[in-house]
Amino acid sequence: MENQTMSNNIPTELKYVASHEWLRLEEDGTITVGITHHAQELLGDIVFVELPEVGANLAAEEQSGVVESVKAASDVYAPIAGEVVAVNDDLPGAPETANSDPYGAGWFFKIKPANPADYDGLLTAEQYAGEVD
């Protein structure tokens, strides 16, 4: 499937949650998580990122990190239950990457879902667009 983006910077191939995290299902069954373009826009210039620990078992909607900007601090939530299998080690040293490339190099962590079927029930790009309009 070709990657497409809605006019409001919401890639159509990803899944979303109302707390403004995006999810991408990888070929190995893990899920990459980051904050959306909308979230980084609301936050402004991001100056600090705290990520979860590799090996942490997170419940869906459990706080998994923190993002601080010049305007505000915001919690990051696990959009799906599972075990953290990787974190973006480059992000704490270059938190502005979450602003400049939120769907690419600005990813936060990868999680091995406790129940892979949970991914299917998350918001589509169109549904998420309805949440932020």
From Swiss-Prot:
Task: List the record's Gene Ontology CC terms alphabetically.
Answer: cytosol; glycine cleavage complex
Could you tell me which CDD domains the record lists for this protein? GCS_H
The source's superkingdom equals Bacteria
Annotated Lipoyl-binding domain ranges read: 30-112
- Cofactor detail note: Binds 1 lipoyl cofactor covalently.
The alphabetical list of record keywords is: Lipoyl
Question: Where in the sequence is N6-lipoyllysine found?
Answer: K71
Q: Which InterPro entries match?
A: Biotin_lipoyl, GCV_H, GCV_H/Fam206, GCV_H_sub, Single_hybrid_motif
Protein's GO biological process: glycine decarboxylation via glycine cleavage system
Q: Which Gene3D superfamilies match?
A: 2.40.50.100
The UniProt entry, under Pfam families, shows: GCV_H
Signal peptide positions (record): none
Summary of subunit composition and partner proteins? The glycine cleavage system is composed of four proteins: P, T, L and H.
The record describes the protein's role as:
The glycine cleavage system catalyzes the degradation of glycine. The H protein shuttles the methylamine group of glycine from the P protein to the T protein.
Which family would the database say this protein is a member of?
Belongs to the GcvH family.
Name of this chain's protein: Glycine cleavage system H protein
* Taxonomic source organism: Neisseria gonorrhoeae (strain ATCC 700825 / FA 1090)
Instruction: Identify the taxonomic lineage of the organism of origin.
Output: Bacteria, Pseudomonadati, Pseudomonadota, Betaproteobacteria, Neisseriales
